[in-house]
C-alpha cells in the first residue's frame, strides 16, 4: 500500500482513482500476474503527469500499464505501483490527415476511427490488442506495415525533469519492433501523432497472405485498396489465427506474437534452408545485408505444432497459430516461462537460430 499521506495527495488529483484490489492478471491480455502494492488509475493526461511526479518524487518503483498486451508479469505480490493509463481522446483532422491519440486509447478503436474517416495508413494494424501509447515503443507492425511508417511525433513525459514535450519520430531510433523507448523507464508516452493518407485508400500493400486475400497480383507495382476492405480482410485473418482478443477464447489469452521474426546473416538463412529443403521457406531482405526469417515457420519446423504440448497443459501454443503462447485458463507465469524456454531452446537446437521474446518481462524472465 501507499503511505497514507501520499495516498491522500494522489487521490486528491482530479482524474485519479486508487485501486487496491486489481491484479496484473486483470490488467494483461495473458491474464497472468500477481498483485501490485497499489494501483493508480489516471483518466486524463494531466492526472497522469501529476501522479507520476508525486510517485517519482517519493522514489517508488512504478510500472506504467496501458492495454497490457505486451507484458509477462510474475506471480505473487510485486513491489511495484501500477500506474494505469486510461486516457482515451482521439482527434482527427480530415483536411491534412493528422490523427492524434491519447496513450490510453484502445489501439484498434484508433484504427477503426481512422478507417471510418476514410484515412489510410494503419488499416493493416487492425485487431492488434493494446493501447495507442505502446505502438511507438515497440514499433508495432503487421502485414508489411509498421507504426513508424506513419508516426510523426510522440508526446513524452521526461521522468527526470517531469517536463512534457513533443518529440519527433526521427529521434526514436525506430526499427523492426524497436524504439529507444523500449528498454528504459526514462520517459512515458502521453500521446501519439500520425500522418495518414486522405484519399480513402490503403498504404501500398505487399504480396503475401493479405495480398492473396485481397486478390492482389504480384504484377501490381504499388497495390492499394479501399481502407475498409483492407481492415475487414486483416480482421478475418487475425481472427482465424486467434489474434483478436475474445474473452471466451483461450487462444486469444496471449501476448500476441510472442517471438520476433529473427534477423540473421544470409549464411545462417542458407543453412536453415539446406536443413529443411523447402523451396517456399519464408525469407526476406532485412537491410544491412541481413535476412528476416519467420519465427512461426521455424517453430513449426522444429517440431512444435499448434496446441503444443497438448490438452490439459496450463500454457500452450495457440491451437490456431504457433507464434502465440497462451494461457489455457489458470496458467501461472512459471508455466508460460517453461513453455517459452522449451520453444526457444528447441528452435536453437534445431536451426542455430535464437528466438527473442517480444513482450516486456516484469519480475521474471525466460531464463528463470
Curated annotation (Swiss-Prot):
Keywords associated with the record: Cell cycle, Cell division, Cell shape, Cell wall biogenesis/degradation, Cytoplasm, FAD, Flavoprotein, NADP, Oxidoreductase, Peptidoglycan synthesis
Localisation per UniProt entry: Cytoplasm
Highest taxon in the source lineage: Bacteria
Keyword Cell division applies: yes
Cofactor(s) essential for the protein: FAD
Pfam families in alphabetical order: FAD_binding_4 (PF01565), MurB_C (PF02873)
This enzyme's EC code(s): 1.3.1.98
Active site, UniProt feature: 177, 257 (proton donor), 358
HAMAP family: MurB
NCBIfam families, alphabetized: PRK13903.1 (NF010478)
Name under which the protein is recorded: UDP-N-acetylenolpyruvoylglucosamine reductase
Organism: Corynebacterium glutamicum (strain R)
Organism phylogeny: Bacteria, Bacillati, Actinomycetota, Actinomycetes, Mycobacteriales
Gene: murB
